[in-house]
Regions:
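Beta-strand->loop->alpha-helix junctions that form or flank phosphate-binding loops
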Residues: 89-97, 115-119, 212-214, 256
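Conserved AMP-binding/adenylation subdomain of ANL enzymes
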Residues: 1-35
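Conserved ATP/PPi-binding loop(s) of AMP-dependent carboxylate-activating enzymes
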Residues: 118-122, 126-154, 189-191
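AMP-binding/adenylate-forming catalytic domain of the ANL superfamily
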Residues: 246-269
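AMP-binding/adenylate-forming catalytic core of the ANL superfamily
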Residues: 137, 143, 150, 165-250
Length: 275
């Protein structure tokens, strides 16, 4: 992402995440023209939670925001569209192994959850029999340095098969459903935790959450929802809300309040720490 900006004579300002939100707005203030930025979903949630009004004041100066690296909830997508009605807001599918494969402007009047758009001109994608996303194109890596064994696990015949579960909709857009290694098996049902999390995050009393597998003394493995509560959090109301939005086997049995959700350096939920 750095090279194209420098190639066309643009300026890049690097900031150390959103440890200080004021630094983010200061960087925009110092730019003589409109700006574009990449923000992981966790950073977007921070801006919406703590600086929504201020962000709206910068609407005319933000050309576009690109997000990726982790799933963004539809609730956050809708809020961002409301705050920045004229800005382009892109949800991008990319990785170190594949480069940028597709992107989707969800501020075009049709805000679709989990949608990552149609393939770029230099790329293509397909879905394997196992439901995994496969990628082809000029931006694929040639392999891991000095590690052909690991390379062969995900790359064959100039094709990278990811661990992402997804499908291609009627418009030819890629729709992600979660990670294959994150799927939770409950009574034979394979459940993507992101689906439960996205619905829960649309409940007004929740700041953040993570859905995990837990052991129940009677019915073995069940879903457990760890919740970072907001000011108006009510567990009974949350359960009723989830029951109105999800199928019965996707309703968490156990609930626990926590101070924060463990995340990786790039804003993804650190699911390994909950296993």
């Amino acid at each position: 992402k750095i090279y194209p900006v420098l190639y066309v004579g643009g300026t890049i300002r690097l900031i150390d995440g959103l440890k200080d939100i004021n630094v983010f707005f200061q960087a925009i203030d110092e730019a003589p023209f409109k700006v574009a930025t990449f923000l992981v979903p966790d950073s977007i949630r921070m801006l919406l939670s703590f600086a929504k009004s201020k962000l709206s004041e910068y609407a005319s100066k933000i050309d576009f925001i690109e997000t990726g690296a982790a799933p963004i909830s539809q609730e956050d997508m809708l809020q961002l569209c409301h705050v920045l009605p004229q800005s382009r807001l892109y949800n991008t599918y990319a990785s170190t192994e594949t480069g940028i494969v597709s992107t989707y402007n969800f501020n075009n009047g049709n805000c679709l959850s989990g949608c990552l758009g149609q393939p770029m001109k230099h790329s293509s994608f397909f879905i394997t029999e196992e439901g995994l996303v496969g990628c082809k194109g000029k931006t694929l890596m040639s392999g891991y340095w000095n590690d052909m064994k690991t390379t062969d696990l995900i790359m064959q015949n100039d094709t990278v098969v990811t661990a992402d579960l997804g499908y291609i909709d009627e418009q030819g857009c890629l729709r992600l459903q979660g990670r294959n290694d994150d799927i939770i098996n409950i009574g034979g049902y394979k459940i993507a935790p992101t689906e439960i999390e996205n619905v829960a995050l649309s409940f007004p009393g929740i700041k953040d959450c993570v859905c995990i597998a837990a052991v129940h003394p009677v019915i073995n493995q069940v879903l457990k929802l760890l919740v970072v509560p907001g000011m108006n959090y009510n567990r009974k109301e949350l359960v009723s809300f989830l029951k109105s939005k999800l199928e019965a086997h996707k309703i968490p049995i156990l609930y626990e309040e926590i101070e924060k959700v463990q995340r990786t350096f790039n804003g993804k939920i650190d699911r390994k720490s909950y296993r």
